[in-house]
Amino acid sequence: MALITDTNRAPAIAPQPKGIIDPNTGRPIGADDPTFLSISDELADRGFLLTTTDELINWARTGSLMWMTFGLACCAVEMMQMSMPRYDCERFGFAPRGSPRQSDVMIVAGTLTNKMAPALRKVYDQMPEPRYVISMGSCANGGGYYHYSYSVVRGCDRVVPVDIYVPGCPPTAEALLYGVLLLQKKIRRTGTIER
């Protein structure tokens, strides 16, 4: 019995991955990341990788960030959309958790009032170290539309330290996902002992 093959057909070639395009460079995010370039060069030269414990922990941490929502207003809808199948933030290692004790990242989305500020700080204090905060939307960043109201905190950075600011009213799910990727890049850049 002979194997029948078509020798006239060209071999199948997988398409190039596109990824999310960086609006500043027009290239996929991470395409010019020195971390990935050095890894591919080292693998090509030696066939194995050498690293420090710090770099290994940072690599593992960026691929397994657990986030907790602190949705206060309309921005929370866009935050939910980021978890849906169209954007699927879990493919970047960014999975939701229901408890602050299991979370690495808190996303503050919406208007933070003076009455809610102590609760935000309490939830932040319950998160294990290292902990990160993403401020999402104009209201969380600086008070937004309600900036001059007597009952609104003019930015959640007055209550908790913020690592990434995502602008917009409300910001799109793509903008939040870009903020998550920037947070992962920031974690790779910084040490594990000191933030």
Swiss-Prot record:
A GO cellular component entry from the record: respiratory chain complex I
Keywords, alphabetical: 4Fe-4S, Cell inner membrane, Cell membrane, Iron, Iron-sulfur, Membrane, Metal-binding, NAD, Quinone, Translocase, Transport, Ubiquinone
Keyword Magnesium found: no
Record GO biological process: aerobic respiration; electron transport coupled proton transport
Localization, UniProt: Cell inner membrane
Top EC category: translocase
GO molecular function, one term: NADH dehydrogenase (ubiquinone) activity
Enzyme Commission no: 7.1.1.-
Protein's UniProt keywords contain Iron-sulfur: yes
Reactions this protein catalyses: a quinone + NADH + 5 H(+)(in) = a quinol + NAD(+) + 4 H(+)(out)
Domain of life: Bacteria
Binding site residues for [4Fe-4S] cluster: 74-75, 139, 169
Cofactor note (record): Binds 1 [4Fe-4S] cluster.
Membrane topology: Peripheral membrane protein
InterPro entries, per the entry: NADH_UbQ_OxRdtase-like_20kDa (IPR006137), NADH_UQ_OxRdtase_20Kd_su (IPR006138)
Cofactor(s) the protein requires to work: [4Fe-4S] cluster
Similarity comment text for this entry: Belongs to the complex I 20 kDa subunit family.
UniProt xrefs under PANTHER family: NADH DEHYDROGENASE, NADH DEHYDROGENASE [UBIQUINONE] IRON-SULFUR PROTEIN 7, MITOCHONDRIAL
Quaternary assembly: NDH-1 is composed of 14 different subunits. Subunits NuoB, C, D, E, F, and G constitute the peripheral sector of the complex.
Alphabetized HAMAP family for the sequence: NDH1_NuoB (MF_01356)
Described function: NDH-1 shuttles electrons from NADH, via FMN and iron-sulfur (Fe-S) centers, to quinones in the respiratory chain. The immediate electron acceptor for the enzyme in this species is believed to be ubiquinone. Couples the redox reaction to proton translocation (for every two electrons transferred, four hydrogen ions are translocated across the cytoplasmic membrane), and thus conserves the redox energy in a proton gradient.
Protein name per UniProt: NADH-quinone oxidoreductase subunit B
UniProt source species: Methylobacterium radiotolerans (strain ATCC 27329 / DSM 1819 / JCM 2831 / NBRC 15690 / NCIMB 10815 / 0-1)
Gene, per the UniProt record: nuoB
